[in-house]
């Protein structure tokens, strides 16, 4: 086992990465190794998908499957070894079908890629784990060195984050052939074990640029189906009655669940990254979308244990449900998996609803505590002139984007302390689950404009980017000249690709934490600092002073 893709990876003087019987996330060495084998299988599939396009063959099943299966290897998504192997077998079957189509048109059709003809050696998981050793991401570390390995992993993990957003967009009916062709090109190239530093750096920026397009179609998918988010108050306390909790990012799953629970007497609560759903008109029209429950994903083993109903996980993040003894009432959907728990392959939530009706639910309603969400792209752009007016009248000094992933590390208290230390004449724009560090606090307003503005899920960084570009255009300056600072927390691969997206767009002087990615070497950090001004958090006082004086 070697996995260094998330923020909580093991860090020692000898090196970084989880490499024992189990990773810090709870992933076993077996599952981790089989994920390496799956990734190699998907790289081979992409190599042939790219070749097939030369013959005018575009297989939509391949295009939809490839990023979805890659998404299953993202942190805290799928811990189920047999399902990982199933994805690998499906990748190989799709690859062979594509290969046959190409060779029917051209008998000499071939792909020069070391994983283009990969086959699984056995049905036995132990045999497959041994085969996976040939595809361990650090297998040639001694030959290429830590810097090249770090850049490879930056590209691989960044592309994995983009694949997750591609799947979210595809579920909502969004497809762009140019994006998928670019995805296959990059994925196939990474399967050749590239070792050129400049090429890898260029690739990382290409992934960031591609992801901007992915976020654009995801935004289109969400707003076309569910309307543009508008500011909405959400109760974060319990309401008496039967209940279901839904977590993750998949708004379509939430919509289907709301439709199927309507009139049943079962209330639906959002959790984690599902919180922004309350801002969408077509979702909040369901009156039994009753509120939001819990805090950051890392607290779920305590909070889920206390929730008196079933829980549906639509995407990341799931962690061991046996710890809180709620494994009999947690349900996984789509690419999510945990051994031994119920899995919903389709969109029928009937068994979940039945379970909810059989459980006690909340015995009484708590005193409501309302927070405001729903500052989507359209709302943010509508406020652009107000922001400019406040700045011109010196009522608004600075905007801080404080957001990103949450996690368990104690140093993450930095982000709570930073938000509460922001001066009263400054605004906080937030997104993703990092907001749970401070989103239940009262920050007041500036002439009626809330000082805490919740822009949505992690992918809604797109809205923040569009706002920044709009403000810069209206003020006749560059984005980096705005009174705007980005203070980002990271945990997994979606955050990595958001960072690459921002860097590829030329955004500079981003502050990130609580630690640097484990695959970043000092040399890579120095390059990113020199080129983009990217740096790690220090202390709240020092960072605040530096950002306000920039």
Swiss-Prot record:
One of its GO terms (biological process) is response to hydrogen peroxide. The modification Cysteine persulfide is found at residue 405. Its EC number is 1.7.99.1. Binds 1 [2Fe-2S] cluster. InterPro entries: HCP/CODH (IPR004137), Hydroxylam_reduct (IPR010048), Prismane-like_a/b-sand (IPR016099), Prismane-like_sf (IPR011254), Prismane_a-bundle (IPR016100). It catalyses: A + NH4(+) + H2O = hydroxylamine + AH2 + H(+). Its cofactor is [2Fe-2S] cluster; hybrid [4Fe-2O-2S] cluster. Hybrid [4Fe-2O-2S] cluster binds at residues 249, 273, 317, 405, 433, 458, 492, 494. Its main location: cytoplasm. Keywords: 2Fe-2S, Cytoplasm, Iron, Iron-sulfur, Metal-binding, Oxidoreductase. [2Fe-2S] cluster binds at residues 3, 6, 18, 25. It is found in: Cytoplasm. Coiled coil: none annotated. One of its GO terms (molecular function) is 2 iron, 2 sulfur cluster binding. Pfam families: Prismane. HAMAP family: Hydroxylam_reduct. Belongs to the HCP family. Catalyzes the reduction of hydroxylamine to form NH(3) and H(2)O. This is Hydroxylamine reductase. It comes from Klebsiella pneumoniae (strain 342).
């Amino acid at each position: 086992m070697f996995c260094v893709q998330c923020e909580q990876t093991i860090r020692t003087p000898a090196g970084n990465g989880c490499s024992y019987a189990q990773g810090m996330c709870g992933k076993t060495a077996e599952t981790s190794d089989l994920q390496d084998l799956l990734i190699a299988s998907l790289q081979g599939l992409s190599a042939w998908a790219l070749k097939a396009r030369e013959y005018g063959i575009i297989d939509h099943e391949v295009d939809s499957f490839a990023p979805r299966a890659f998404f299953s290897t993202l942190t805290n998504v799928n811990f189920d070894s047999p399902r990982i192997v199933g994805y690998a077998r499906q990748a190989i079957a799709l690859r062979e079908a594509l290969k046959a189509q190409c060779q029917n048109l051209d008998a000499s059709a071939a792909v020069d890629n070391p994983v283009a003809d990969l086959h699984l050696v056995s049905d036995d998981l132990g045999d497959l784990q041994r085969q996976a050793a040939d595809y361990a991401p650090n297998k040639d570390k001694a030959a290429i060195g830590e810097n090249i390995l770090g850049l490879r992993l930056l590209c691989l993990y960044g592309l994995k984050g983009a694949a997750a957003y591609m799947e979210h967009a595809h579920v909502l009916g969004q497809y762009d052939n140019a994006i998928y062709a670019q995805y296959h090109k990059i994925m196939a190239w990474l399967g050749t074990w590239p070792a050129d530093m400049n090429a890898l750096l260029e690739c990382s920026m290409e992934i960031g640029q591609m992801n901007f397009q992915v976020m654009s179609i995801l935004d289109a998918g969400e707003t076309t189906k569910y309307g543009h988010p508008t500011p909405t108050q959400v109760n974060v306390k319990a309401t008496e009655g039967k209940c279901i909790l839904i977590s993750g990012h998949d708004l379509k799953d939430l919509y289907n669940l709301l439709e199927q629970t309507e009139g049943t007497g079962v209330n639906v609560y959002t959790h984690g990254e599902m919180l922004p759903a309350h801002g969408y008109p077509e979702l909040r029209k369901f009156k039994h979308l009753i509120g939001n429950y819990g805090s950051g994903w890392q607290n779920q083993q305590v909070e889920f244990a206390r929730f008196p109903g079933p829980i549906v996980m639509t995407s990341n993040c799931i962690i061991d449900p046996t710890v809180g003894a709620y494994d009999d009432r947690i349900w996984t959907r789509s690419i999510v998996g945990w051994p031994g728990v119920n899995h919903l392959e389709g969109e029928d939530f009937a068994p979940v609803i039945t379970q909810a009706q059989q459980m006690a639910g909340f015995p009484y309603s708590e005193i409501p505590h309302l927070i405001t969400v729903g500052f989507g792209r359209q709302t943010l752009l509508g406020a652009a002139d107000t922001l400019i007016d406040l700045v011109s009248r010196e009522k608004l000094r600075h905007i801080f984007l404080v957001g990103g992933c949450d996690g368990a590390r104690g140093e993450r208290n930095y982000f709570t302390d930073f938000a509460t230390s922001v001066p009263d004449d400054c605004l906080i724009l937030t997104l993703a689950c990092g907001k749970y560090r401070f989103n239940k606090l009262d920050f007041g307003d500036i002439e009626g404009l809330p000082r805490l503005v919740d822009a949505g899920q992690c992918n809604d960084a797109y809205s923040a980017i569009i706002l920044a570009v709009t403000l810069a255009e209206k003020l006749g300056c560059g984005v980096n000249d705005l009174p705007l600072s980005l203070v980002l927390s990271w945990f997994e691969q979606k955050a990595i690709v958001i960072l690459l997206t921002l860097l590829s767009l030329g955004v500079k002087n981003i502050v990130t934490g609580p630690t640097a990615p484990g695959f970043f070497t000092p040399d890579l950090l120095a390059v990113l600092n020199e080129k983009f001004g990217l740096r790690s958090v220090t202390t709240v006082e020092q960072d605040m002073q530096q950002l306000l004086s920039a």
